[in-house]
Amino acid sequence: MNAYELNMDGLVGQTHHYAGLSSGNIASTNNALSISNPQAAARQGLEKMRQLYNMGLKQGLLPPHQRPNLNLLYQLGFKGSPSEQINKAYKTAPELLSACYSASSMWTANAATVSASVDTEDNKVHFTAANLISNLHRHQEADFSKKLLEFIFSNSDYFNHHPLLPKSMGTSDEGAANHNRLCQSHAHSGINLFVYGKKVLGNHQFEQSPIKYPARQTKEASEAIARNHLLNPERVIFACQNPLAIDQGVFHNDVISVANEHVFLVHEEAFYNQAYVLDQLKEKADFPLVIIQISKEQISVSEAVDTYLFNSQLITLPDQKNMILIAPAECQANLKVKTCIDGLVADSQNPINSVYYLDLKQSMRNGGGPACLRLRVPLNDYELKAMHQGILIDNDLLDILDKWVLKYYRTELKISDLADPQLLYECLDALDELTQILKLGSIYPFQS
């Protein structure tokens, strides 16, 4: 039976803007209050989907969440009509209004953690939507992400959905951005590598903590997901992220490492006690594991964060053994990083034999590269057929979506534009049409 890695990219929403809401995300902070271009952001994302689809990969999308989040505004004390809520929030707490308008659901690597059926005891694909409690603007995504995934993967013969982990600091969960799966191929059972930044309960005196920026993922959350997903404990590793890397802007592990099948591309300063982590991987691997460790002399952690090299997608084309690195254009523009990539491609000791650079500037300026924009869902033929087909990409659907973006998206969005009630109605009109395009039914709160 065939097995695939379905890339589910987040479709960028109309309220994409730069507000600097994410502590520890250096790009987000550095570009705060600058002017965004939501139309360009969405079209760059669609072009990424088109490129991967035309390479022969299975490609889907997750739609934007409803914004502004009027219910969150209400919870925060802003009452009245939608226009009154927006006006009051803008005048007294514009940063809260910005959070309620956030389009951060575009980074679907944080939407959930997904386990392949070949790895689970009940042979079903398991999903746990991330609670994302570390940031206000992201925590609001959790319930709707769960609802979306339950709709798209609704057949209980193949798919198992778990409740969100408790919304507490002890079980803070950031989704697949802190999870890697290593295997001989997508069809084979794999090693699940969960990465955490802190342990909250019990004795954790032997592990360090970041000082400058907060660690988001807890070990307790990762362990709970592994248990709920019925993963074989002998095939699971829990690794602590290097706190020094977190303090340099590595807020998720997918900013400092990337895995695909039997290849693990990782910076030498990614993990606390890295030699032990890599030894565990080698010990558990019953396949020819290829670890490509990039030294700090080749690329510093700071340079990795600036260019998002490790937030590239590493992909295997159908019926091929070689791999392609899908990297942000910022890597090509940095001579040191490009030289490193050229060396990887030229090295016959690893399967990476080409690189493709993507322009994702709008997302990158908010701290999201190619890997941030996609949730990996491992599926076999039966599972792929059993899911909702309306969100699966082909060129015809991409053409329709491109016209939809041109119709509804602004080419410029400033923080002051969030005070315009008309933006709310533009968003609702667009989402109403989108649900028809993707055959999602009345899935948004305003449609019920």
Swiss-Prot record:
Q: Where is the active site?
A: 174, 252, 372 (nucleophile)
- Biological process annotations from GO: arginine catabolic process to glutamate; arginine catabolic process to succinate
- Classification via InterPro entries: AstB_sf, SuccinylArg_d-Hdrlase_AstB
Taking the record's annotation, the residue ranges forming a coiled coil are none
What EC number(s) does the entry state? 3.5.3.23
Catalytic activities:
N(2)-succinyl-L-arginine + 2 H2O + 2 H(+) = N(2)-succinyl-L-ornithine + 2 NH4(+) + CO2
**A GO molecular-function descriptor:** N-succinylarginine dihydrolase activity
Q: Does the keyword Hydrolase apply?
A: yes
- Record's keyword annotation contains Nucleotidyltransferase: no
Question: Which SUPFAM superfamilies does this chain map to?
Answer: Pentein
Question: Keywords, A to Z?
Answer: Arginine metabolism, Hydrolase
Organism superkingdom: Bacteria
Binding of substrate occurs at 19-28, 110, 137-138, 216, 254, 366
What's this protein's family per the entry? Belongs to the succinylarginine dihydrolase family.
Subunit? Homodimer.
Give the protein's biological function. Answer: Catalyzes the hydrolysis of N(2)-succinylarginine into N(2)-succinylornithine, ammonia and CO(2).
Name-wise, this protein is N-succinylarginine dihydrolase
Q: Which organism is it from?
A: Legionella pneumophila (strain Paris)
**Gene from which this protein is expressed:** astB
